[in-house]
């Protein structure tokens, strides 16, 4: 059995120890949860999760891998992933990369081995909560103090929305799209 190498620290002082995957980087964000059984690639690349650390309640994530065609946006902007177990060797004919490989490439940390259902209950009972995924060797008290001082962004829509109009010339019917959160990718 491997020994723990990462920790999730919540602003209320709760510390969860787990196993690292993805980028070896400390990032803070609002901890949220997703109860879907599938669609983890779409979730990690969904602009609506900008600045958030996403907890998946389904027990095994990454089993069908990642492929370029299923990204919701070109530049995912989540701050981290929390899973019970991450699949190291995905199996699907469309698999191009493992979840671990993609998170490393995108510089997003992940932590596994966490009781995600317990964490989800905490979020449901207490509401919005900040958290940070960091190496286990980092002092939890110091990380907690820094986390409490961290201001999370409040302009997420501005960060992920297009700043200019796009025109597409063509024949046939004319269509107008008003962007209230359209995904690109």
Predicted regions and their residues:
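RNA-binding accessory domains that recognize and position tRNA/RNA substrates
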Residues: 1-185
């Amino acid at each position: 059995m491997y020994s723990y190498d990462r920790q999730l620290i919540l602003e209320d002082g709760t510390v969860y120890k787990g196993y690292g995957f993805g980028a070896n980087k400390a990032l803070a964000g609002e901890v949220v949860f997703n109860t879907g059984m599938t669609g983890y690639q779409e979730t990690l690349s969904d602009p609506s999760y900008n600045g958030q650390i996403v907890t998946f309640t389904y027990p095994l994530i990454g089993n069908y891998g990642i492929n370029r065609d299923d990204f919701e946006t070109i530049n995912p902007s989540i701050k981290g992933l929390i899973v019970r177990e991450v699949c190291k060797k995905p199996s699907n004919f469309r698999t191009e990369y493992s979840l671990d490989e993609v998170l490393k490439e995108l510089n997003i940390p992940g932590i596994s081995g966490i009781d995600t259902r317990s964490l989800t209950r905490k979020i449901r009972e207490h509401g919005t909560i900040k958290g940070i995924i960091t190496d286990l060797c980092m002092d939890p008290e110091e990380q907690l103090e820094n986390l409490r001082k961290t201001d999370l962004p409040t302009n997420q829509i501005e960060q992920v929305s297009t700043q200019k109009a796009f025109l597409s010339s063509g024949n046939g019917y004319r269509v107008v799209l008003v962007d209230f959160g359209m995904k690109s990718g």
